[in-house]
Amino acid sequence: MASITHRRNAVLGAAFLMATSAIGPGFLTQTATFTNTLLASFGFVILLSILLDIGAQLNIWRIVIVSGKRAQDISNAVFPKAGYFLAALIVMGGLAFNIGNVGGAGLGLNSIFGIAPEMGAVISGIIAILIFLRKEAGLLMDRFAQLMGFIMVVLTFYVMFKTEPPVVEAAYHSFIPEQIDPIAIVTLVGGTVGGYITFAGAHRLLDAGIQGEKAMAEVSRSSVSAILIASTMRVVLFLAVLGVVSKGVSLNPKNPAETPFEYVAGNFGQVLFGVVIWAASVTSVIGAAYTSVSFLTTLCPTIERNRNRWIIAFIVISTVVLVTVGKPAAVLVFVGTLNGLILPIALALILLAAYRSDIVGTYKHPVFLAFSGWFVVIIMAILSGKTIISYISSFFS
């Protein structure tokens, strides 16, 4: 019974860890901004991105778990040193985004208690560190992610209900959009399963001892659940923002996602949004640190033996940089652009591994999953490549 309970908790915990890692301050801002631009047609973008997210994540999680190896080890088996390259991209991207996550947590406590954002960032960093000071850090991380995810969705759902969004119109344009923005699709897919995010849950399952072909049903369920949890938050926030925008309310350009909360609850709405952005940010801090370090553990035995200390160091560095330097905009933009390449590169390596018996044994990867995976690789590679070329051109102009 204990083993069954442990597996169920691990499967649920992995889903919430991945989902709450995706729901960070950038997730909230992007959702509000695109809703303001595309209005009800943003529902179509969300729907399409959900399908692409599921296609990408199912491929990655199933192959990682059936092989019993972390993504960097699979990559090294496919191409020598490819795992080191992937790990470098993940860690750079994870650190850059974690600086933003710590900043978001600081802003959240500033909205709730009125303390300085820098002090809020330090307090949030300490709270995240406390989890990894305990021996049962994995279980605490799972439970914390579940609690924060529940709080975020419930508060945002309340705000959505109060803004009275045009649900019928949103549902209609989710299938028949008036306009389509390819950049919005790429941004949503990259923000949900890009970078370190999709590997958070897969590596968590491995750490919980869930691996092998016999675990495929659990893994598929956890993988899809993670996408649906993150997407539920996006849909609810989309409708909340659509509710105020459809009434002619202009979004606050400094913090667009906060607008529906203020519309519903006035000044207290800032406190409500503070709770949401803090929960979103601090869980992303934890997810980014945990997953980034998980990409180094098998490449360096010293890190494996002192994993929690390295996770704590990762959080400390992110917090110190935020407090002393702030958000180094140029670095964040550049690393964020590189981060867009992680999904097509990592997914391509994982898909190549699916046909290597020395990696997956006798496992037969479903053809339709492989097809959907390669489709995501091609689309994301093209659009991410265009973004990087545009960035380099603007840098030298």
Curated annotation (Swiss-Prot):
Transmembrane segments annotated in the record for this chain: 9-29, 38-58, 85-105, 112-132, 148-168, 182-202, 226-246, 271-291, 310-330, 331-351, 365-385
Keyword set includes 4Fe-4S: no
KW Transmembrane helix (keyword) present: yes
Record localization: Cell membrane
GO biological process, one term: iron ion transmembrane transport
GO CC, one annotated term: plasma membrane
Species name: Haemophilus influenzae (strain ATCC 51907 / DSM 11121 / KW20 / Rd)
InterPro entries referenced in this protein's UniProt entry, alphabetically: NRAMP_fam
Family (UniProt): Belongs to the NRAMP family.
Protein name: Uncharacterized membrane protein HI_1728
Topological relation to the membrane, as annotated: Multi-pass membrane protein
